[in-house]
Amino acid sequence: MIEHIDSLNDARLDVFMRLTEVQLRNKLEPEKGVFIAESDKVISRALNAGYEPLSLLIPNHKLALMQSLIERINAINPAIPVFVAPAQEIKNLTGYELTRGILCAFRRKPLVSVKKLLMGAKRVAVLENITNHTNIGALFRSAAALNVDAIILNQGCCDPLYRRAIRVSMGTVFRVSWTRVGEDPRAVKVDDILAENSEETSPDKERQKLSSYAYQGDALRWPHEALVRLKELGFTTAALALNDNSVALDDPRLKACEKLALLFGTEGEGLSYQTLEECDYVVKIPMAHGVDSLNVAAASAVTFWELCR
């Protein structure tokens, strides 16, 4: 449903600029969360992945070019608003020129448990405390291209559905299934609530009831419970890091693993000591000219090429 906007003060446009990424994500109620996708190609990939469109924003001079996409969204629900406004007015609203022609707000999907995510998976990436959205987007793009079945992020990682991460990934964040593990320090603590209500309810039932509010994804504690779960599901764990016990990336034992989980750490300090201690292998990428490390996005691409084909 096309609506020409007379005033950018319209509250329905808040989702495109006036709400922060954190407000869009709505961590305590992820079923109400929203993300923004840019460009017809990325929006089409989100639609292909089954995400629910909520509204679109298009500069008036791009309206004709986006007609086929608008028709596709109208077929999903003709009541979905397509807001149209002059390009300069949209720039004033968003703070930048809409060079990719279109923005679309989508409803987030609930995240699933690790067990459900990894049904049928053979090669997975596990990310710890990676906070750079460009790196997250690039890593997802490499994972999609190089046959990674799923990605697990701990709560210290940034959001794969952050606008920049989606843009860098070219929408491949919608093609690789993912979830989060670990307690979110910014969310309600289940154990604290249980302590307050210990005499009134069964802890197991109360934990199950509250977990969807306190955690986004799987409430397995990071790293111990998450890595134990991976091993219970048959995965060998291999951490990318440089230490005295590292094996080379082309070690035949790694390729021989039926199920392999590849762990990557934060851009600066890498994986934590506890995480390294709990992994089956520590793996290094052989390098020349005295270079001792690669950017995590580059390292993941090299690793996926070697072990996920």
Question: Where are these predicted regions, by residue range?
Answer:
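A glycine-rich helix N-cap at a beta->alpha junction
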Residues: 78-86
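Boundary-proximal intrinsically disordered activation/regulatory segments immediately upstream
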Residues: 1-61
